[in-house]
Amino acid sequence: MSYEDYQYNETLTQEDCWTVISSFFEETSLARQQLFSFDEFVQNTMQEIVDDDSTLTLDQYAQHTGAQGDVTRRYEINFGQIYLSRPTMTEADGSTTTMFPQEARLRNLTYSSPLYVDMRKKVMVAADSNVPIGEEEWLVEEEDEEPSKVFIGKIPIMLRSTFCILNGVSDSELYDLNECPYDQGGYFIINGSEKVIIAQERSAANIVQVFKKAAPSPIAYVAEIRSALERGSRLISSMQIKLMARNTENSGQTIRATLPYIRSDIPIVIVFRALGVVPDRDILEHICYDPNDFQMLEMMKPCIEEAFVIQDKDIALDYIGKRGSTTGVTREKRLRYAHDILQKELLPHITTMEGFETRKAFFLGYMIHRMLLCALERREPDDRDHFGKKRLDLAGPLLASLFRMLFRKMTRDVYKYMQKCVETNREFNLTLAVKSNIITNGLRYSLATGNWGDQKRSMVNRVGVSQVLNRYTFASTLSHLRRTNTPIGRDGKLAKPRQLHNTHWGMVCPAETPEGQACGLVKNLSLMSYVSVGSPSAPIIEFLEEWGLETLEDYNPSASPNATKVFVNGVWLGVHRDPAHLTETLRSLRRRLDISAEVSIVRDIREKELRLFTDAGRICRPLFIVDNNPNSERRGELCIRKEHIQQLIEDKDRYDIDPEQRFGWTALVSSGLIEYLDAEEEETVMIAMSPEDLEASRQMQAGYEVKEELDPAQRVKPAPNPHVHAWTHCEIHPAMILGILASIIPFPDHNQSPRNTYQSAMGKQAMGVYLTNYQVRMDTMANILYYPQKPLATTRSMEYLKFRELPAGQNAIVAILCYSGYNQEDSIIMNQASIDRGLFRSIFYRTYTDQEKKIGMTVMEEFERPVRSTTLRMKHGTYDKLEDDGLIAPGTRVSGEDIIIGKTAPIPLDHEELGQRTQLHAKRDVSTPLRSTESGIVDQVMVTTNQEGLKFVKVRMRSTRIPQIGDKFASRHGQKGTIGMTYRHEDMPFSAQGIVPDIIINPHAIPSRMTVAHLVECQLSKVSALSGFEGDATPFTDVTVEAVSKLLRSHGFQSRGFEVMYHGHTGRKLVAQVFLGPTYYQRLKHLVDDKIHARARGPVQILTRQPVEGRSRDGGLRFGEMERDCQISHGCSSVLRERLFDCSDAYRVIVCDICGLIAIASYKKDSYECRSCQNRTRFSQVYLPYAAKLLFQELMSMNIAPRLFTKNHK
């Protein structure tokens, strides 16, 4: 077999890479990070939270009254195992049934599961009640044999997670349940609306970061760490170590530490002495590992001099205790207080237990060491925006913090109940003790409103954590499930956190971010990125101890200054002598899945550190592993080979084998062919861009001269870097750096970058089919395109976004041409004949909801057809279309302000109703009218009951929206435009074959925007329409314009897509040739019918009597400050007076000529008076804006007299 054949067979082709990507998406959905995180919460975290607070103890001390039964008792309640069942609902009559998601949506219920916990109570008696507290011996008096299962609340369930009814259900069964098989889940249903939890980005805890402070600050450098326990509360204790700047009086730069609960900064030498490291030499050893590093030792000089006075552990503790929050206590207590703070609050992530002072001292020394390295300029200060130092809190951690808070609240209530029972000698009932609605309502409140945390302290909570799931287009739904948010103030003009960072490569989409104030703060995950759910660190620590880790207690820095420090989740565990071997071993264990695949192993050779992370919220992405075993004959090639790809393809369609045995994505990971790397570990590896590049580089290493034949049309590729000797990983495909919406863009690599960002925003507003079950859903609003088409120019990624199955647009024939001038400034001309044949026609659904509410115990509202004789306050729309039950029949045509749900509420007997009420009027009208601007046909009426068993209706209305002048359209390249004119078929230009374009856009839209991909897409679509194959417009592939042109030429067309066209009016040949071809266009949701608005007269605000604002309230158009300034600059004073006064809030005021204040006037009787002046004759009439009159009267109420004096103009 010659070398050529071998090479051909072995190098992975692009096609093979896509096979691997397909296997990835077959195994996991696009909402996987949401589902994994929620499953971890339900299966592990919830039980851990219960175990953390598992015992309630109440001691009842003997009263020493000598009476019988006067003994010291201890009551204990234990929480044990928790149980979560499938989602259920309790009807108003008390029956319990299984709940399905569709039912929850339609009946406005919450899709949640009941949570039970084993509770066990125990009463113990002290053997002798005269012993001091804390030394009693307890004898069990009574104990429950069996723990009782108690209902403690309902947990909302994420759709398609392990506990959801739809989990593992086949497509045909989904149809029976009225669910769409394309729906990915990953959201909750709260009160009938779909809520998604947006991932919250935060800085990682437990990592040391060093920053340089700007010039005027008294601090030169600061090292900070925010500690949090590995699991347990989010109570973060932060600590800083500051290197003071050189000031004039004392030239030395001292180092101080900020300790929690201590008011002033403490010199670090004192902190070391308080931790029990007393001699100067020992302190220096903790900080400076190399005794010959005189520069660093010199930096420490001022610190040691500063703390020279304090030479003893107790004195150091006292020094710290004196600066604590407690004052005027005994020395004994101060020492205890300082000791407790050092034990529990200083670096709590290392441990909060007794006897670990050595570890804390070493860690403190490490922090100072890091800071001094920066100060000596041997190391760069840290980068705040490094993505490896960020964590994403998904549904799991967010719900966990909420659940922990609510569970504690509930146990406090149980404790109070227990106290009450013990005091009053009542029987203690576990079911009564637990208030189950604390957890139920707490979780529901946070998910429903997005205010994360306690309902009572809603000001301090995070807002917008949960949002209503965007159901406009299928792609917008997917994108919403993968969105992340950075909670820093939107108004801050900080540019740094918003910028794209190198470490974002492959983790978040570079194009998909909103424009405006949230730009760069709201991000979207890339297609293949994965968020770690967290795994316990104990097994790794155990393994390290077996593999020769020297603990800090035995570590002598001066003896081995070159040992590598080992950190696990930010905790310095010890040092190791052979880091290379250790790293290699850990990696091979991870590739065999002996330790979790999401653990990251970062070996920093220069700083001599090995950092391991197992925590939740790190963002990782998969990469091919390159074989780097020195003994292997395939060194420098990918571990994954053709036979693996072959096996993937074979097993893909085999349904007869068990899913566990199938060779899929998981098998690739467990066979060590692919591994997940996070942003931190990515910096320690070398990644080739594609298997071809890897192969080219390998041949270069082997000494083959690769002669490139120069093709001028070929895509320019950088030559392989001769200095790279070994690659460790290889990208699966560079197209995977994009997110959901950017993956829909054809050739995004040929566009100017902001254009891709604009399209990513507009793709969310395109009409299409958002789900296949839209007929059975009652969404508030929905737009469905009549004839959606799959695009002719597709990307490979669309396969996984189901864009072919649920597209959002149509392939229109587009000519780029100036024609008549009705397509200037981004407007487009559309062919009326195409519109009449159904191009871009869409249907619009809107749902109106109402229910009979209870008012008090007995009285309730009622659906009926209101009658004018017995009902007050009836609306002015027509009630004729209602049936007797107060609802409208499906199929009825309705227009603005018709009543579609008739409902009345009883009037209490004592209400006067502004004197309109007579004996007959017993009810008032609370009906729902159609929106004033809409019209259509009633599509569906649903009558059901809600949770309380009250009658509840939803009425869905539909109307057809036909494209018309003013509607907005866009191609997939940020080229948006509105229809400027529709021409009849006979007025449009036509080509030699008689092809008439559907859309004509202006050539001026192309040059300045540089959307070359728009033109390439048009050309490629033309080829694929002629050849009958989909055109592949995936980014970063070798498709060139030249290749497409050749194909177009072979079909007998001009190679660049130009065609001769004839003028529609005259039939003459157009002078220039016209670029003509199919382009995929999207109809956006901004329709002129929903925006058109004008007003002559209408409602005014009560307070200022100026017109109200807003189209829905029939408001006026604001004539603002800038408009006013223009009129002033033109000198049009009468126009100004008319706009701002006559047409707004003109008002007639009578003013007393003596005092200049507003007088009492009765226009009917023609009598005026000013009582303070006893004036009845001398008045002036003034016209004022009502707002000015209001201002004057408000000033009068504050004892300021605005006096209006008038002149008589003869």
Swiss-Prot record:
GO terms for biological process: siRNA-mediated pericentric heterochromatin formation; transcription by RNA polymerase II; transcription initiation at RNA polymerase II promoter. It catalyses: RNA(n) + a ribonucleoside 5'-triphosphate = RNA(n+1) + diphosphate. The keyword Signal does not apply. It is found in: Nucleus. Mg(2+) binds at D826. Gene3D superfamilies: 2.40.50.150, 3.90.1070.20, DNA-directed RNA polymerase, subunit 2, domain 6, RNA polymerase alpha subunit dimerisation domain, RNA polymerase Rpb2, domain 2. Its EC number is 2.7.7.6. Zn(2+) binds at C1152, C1155, C1170, C1173. GO terms for molecular function: DNA binding; DNA-directed RNA polymerase activity; ribonucleoside binding; RNA binding; zinc ion binding. GO terms for cellular component: cytosol; mitochondrion; nucleus; pericentric heterochromatin; RNA polymerase II, core complex; RNA polymerase II, holoenzyme. Pfam families: RNA_pol_Rpb2_1, RNA_pol_Rpb2_2, RNA_pol_Rpb2_3, RNA_pol_Rpb2_4, RNA_pol_Rpb2_5, RNA_pol_Rpb2_6, RNA_pol_Rpb2_7. It comes from the Eukaryota. A zinc finger (C4-type) spans 1152-1173. Keywords: DNA-directed RNA polymerase, Magnesium, Metal-binding, Nucleotidyltransferase, Nucleus, Transcription, Transferase, Zinc, Zinc-finger. DNA-dependent RNA polymerase catalyzes the transcription of DNA into RNA using the four ribonucleoside triphosphates as substrates. Second largest component of RNA polymerase II which synthesizes mRNA precursors and many functional non-coding RNAs. Proposed to contribute to the polymerase catalytic activity and forms the polymerase active center together with the largest subunit. Pol II is the central component of the basal RNA polymerase II transcription machinery. It is composed of mobile elements that move relative to each other. NCBIfam families: PRK09606.1. Component of the RNA polymerase II (Pol II) complex consisting of 12 subunits. Belongs to the RNA polymerase beta chain family. The binding of ribonucleoside triphosphate to the RNA polymerase II transcribing complex probably involves a two-step mechanism. The initial binding seems to occur at the entry (E) site and involves a magnesium ion coordinated by three conserved aspartate residues of the two largest RNA Pol II subunits. This is DNA-directed RNA polymerase II subunit RPB2. It comes from Schizosaccharomyces pombe (strain 972 / ATCC 24843) (Fission yeast). The gene is rpb2.
